[in-house]
């Protein structure tokens, strides 16, 4: 049986690195795909390249899609403050980037079809950031239907399948799995701020640090990061 090929969307963060490592554990030949979309935290792309190398991905590509051209998100527009006080239930946080995952998944599916990849690996999570509309199971299910209809491979019955193993996991479980898999957590980048070091106060940093402490690895928290 030939080795399965998977395209992994790799942001440089903990979740996407863990999802890619899970695909590797299952024996997949993994190709990483990252995006320069005009994000303030461009540092994550350096992390993505380093993670791809350390995990031993077969290839790693970085595509430019400048979503910052029209702003609309705290991650692409410096005039919008990055929240530090938690996600308000029932509201979509300002760190949501309009259409980001729809664009990323579409490009990922294009690469998957061109390379004959059987699945597209996503590190999306609906638990910690349930306010994001494009990180939810119903969104992923609907997109799978679209992908099956919108591609030659899908119409022929062998289109890439969206695989989001972390979608219902807690952050603590993700950290524990990352530790088990040997994911280079210290290399990953989760901070939303555009500095050279994690800020430790944005929602992404706080959720990550809380999970690391609960998992018994406070040494990997942003406050101790180099």
From Swiss-Prot:
The identity of this protein, by name, is: 7-cyano-7-deazaguanine synthase
Q: Which PANTHER family match?
A: 7-CYANO-7-DEAZAGUANINE SYNTHASE
Residues annotated as binding Zn(2+) are 191, 199, 202, 205
Q: Which cofactor does it need?
A: Zn(2+)
Positions binding ATP in this chain are 10-20
Q: Which Gene3D superfamilies match?
A: HUPs (3.40.50.620)
Q: Name one GO molecular function term.
A: zinc ion binding
Q: Which SUPFAM superfamilies match?
A: Adenine nucleotide alpha hydrolases-like
Question: Hey, which pathway is this one from?
Answer: Purine metabolism; 7-cyano-7-deazaguanine biosynthesis
**Cofactor comment in the record?**
Binds 1 zinc ion per subunit.
């Amino acid at each position: 049986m030939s080795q399965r090929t998977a395209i992994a969307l790799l942001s440089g963060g903990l979740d996407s690195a863990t999802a890619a490592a899970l695909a590797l554990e299952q024996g997949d030949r993994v190709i990483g795909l990252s995006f320069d979309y005009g994000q303030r935290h461009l540092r994550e792309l350096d992390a993505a390249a380093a993670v791809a190398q350390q995990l031993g991905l077969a290839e790693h590509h970085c595509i430019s899609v400048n979503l910052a051209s029209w702003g609309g998100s705290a991650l692409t527009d410096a005039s919008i403050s990055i929240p530090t006080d938690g996600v308000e239930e029932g509201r979509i946080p300002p760190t949501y980037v309009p259409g980001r995952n729809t664009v990323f998944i579409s490009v990922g599916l294009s690469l998957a079809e061109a390379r004959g990849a059987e699945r597209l690996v996503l590190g999306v999570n609906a638990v910690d950031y349930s306010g994001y509309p494009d990180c939810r199971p119903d969104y992923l299910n609907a997109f799978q239907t679209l992908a099956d209809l919108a591609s030659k491979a899908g119409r022929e019955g062998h289109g890439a399948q969206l695989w989001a193993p972390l979608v219902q996991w807690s952050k603590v479980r993700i950290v524990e799995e990352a530790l088990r898999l040997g994911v280079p957590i210290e290399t990953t980048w989760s901070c939303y701020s555009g500095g050279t070091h994690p800020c430790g106060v944005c929602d992404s940093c706080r959720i990550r640090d809380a999970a690391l402490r609960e998992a018994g690895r406070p040494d990997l928290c942003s406050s101790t990061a180099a």
